[in-house]
Regions:
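ATP-dependent small-molecule kinase phosphotransfer cores
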Residues: 1-48
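Generic leucine side-chain signal with a strong bias for well-ordered alpha-helical environments
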Residues: 6, 11, 52, 56-57, ...
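Short beta->alpha linker loops
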Residues: 6, 28-29, 74-75, 99-102, ...
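Residue-level recognition of specific faces of alpha-helices
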Residues: 14, 21-24, 50-53, 68, ...
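Short alpha-helical
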Residues: 20, 32, 57-58, 77-78, ...
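ATP-dependent NMP and nucleoside kinases share a basic, alpha-helical "lid"
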Residues: 34-44, 49-85
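Small-molecule kinase domains that catalyze NTP-dependent phosphoryl transfer to phosphate-bearing small molecules
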Residues: 36, 64-65, 81, 85, ...
């Protein structure tokens, strides 16, 4: 890439190790992200269901855009291992990112449905299907 390309890994190291830098970046980015989601949702307003996948939903204050919140959950050990594997982070970098997030218990309390992703794919699909069941027996 060229000099204008964003080095996401370097930026992540900076903002997740320094709370002041993270707050500064969030103050710049979160309003732009919110505006983008509001625009996308307006375009999709006639759809019966719209799914948003937002890693920092509560932290960014984007939960107000949602009529229902499903939280995908796993053990802290799995969360750390998955971040290291998926994002190529060191253990310390992954821990810094987790420390920057709300505690999972706080997120669980605000979720309408918690999807346990600590097992296999079939367990995950069953958990998603349980969240999709409505009180009247219909699904999404």
């Amino acid at each position: 890439g060229n000099a204008a390309d964003l080095d996401r890994k370097a930026l992540g190291r900076i903002v997740f190790s320094d709370p002041d830098q993270r707050r500064w970046l969030e103050a710049l980015i979160h309003p732009v992200v919110r505006e983008r989601f509001q625009h996308e949702l307006a375009e999709l307003r006639d759809e019966p269901v719209v799914v948003l996948m937002i890693p920092l939903l509560f932290e960014a204050g984007l939960d107000v855009l949602c009529s229902e919140i499903w939280l995908v959950d796993c053990t802290p050990k799995q969360q750390l291992e998955r971040m290291i594997q998926r994002d190529g982070l060191t253990k310390n970098e992954a821990q810094d990112r987790l420390q920057a997030q709300w505690p999972i218990a706080r997120k669980r309390d605000r979720a309408d449905c918690v999807i346990d992703n600590s097992g296999g794919v079939n367990d995950l699909l069953a958990a998603v299907n349980r969240c999709g069941l409505r009180a009247d027996g219909t699904t999404w």
